[in-house]
Swiss-Prot record:
Cross-referenced InterPro entries: CHCH, Ribosomal_mS37_fun
Protein task: Component of the mitochondrial ribosome (mitoribosome), a dedicated translation machinery responsible for the synthesis of mitochondrial genome-encoded proteins, including at least some of the essential transmembrane subunits of the mitochondrial respiratory chain. The mitoribosomes are attached to the mitochondrial inner membrane and translation products are cotranslationally integrated into the membrane.
Motif (Cx9C motif 1): 30-40
Organism: Schizosaccharomyces pombe (strain 972 / ATCC 24843)
Position of the signal peptide: none
Example GO molecular function: structural constituent of ribosome
GO CC terms: mitochondrial small ribosomal subunit
Disulfide bonds: 30-63, 40-53
Protein's UniProt name: Small ribosomal subunit protein mS37
Amino acid sequence: MSKKIVNPPRLQGLSRLRVRPKREKNTIPCGQEMAALLGCWQNHGGQTDTAQCANLVAALENCMKTTHRKTKSENTINYHLARLGKLL
């Protein structure tokens, strides 16, 4: 015997379809260089113009010049879900 489903279940309509963005790890560019420089300043009595930390200052400046910030690309999936939601 085969069973017939009289009333198939229906999904509830969603008012808005949205996807939550991924949480990205906050990576600090040049963070290691900055931490090393701050540690050097702390070890030398808080003086920021010491000759011992000059190489770390140069490394941090070089890192800041060469590092480019990534531009955040806009996610288009929410746009497509909004259009699809009108059809459902």
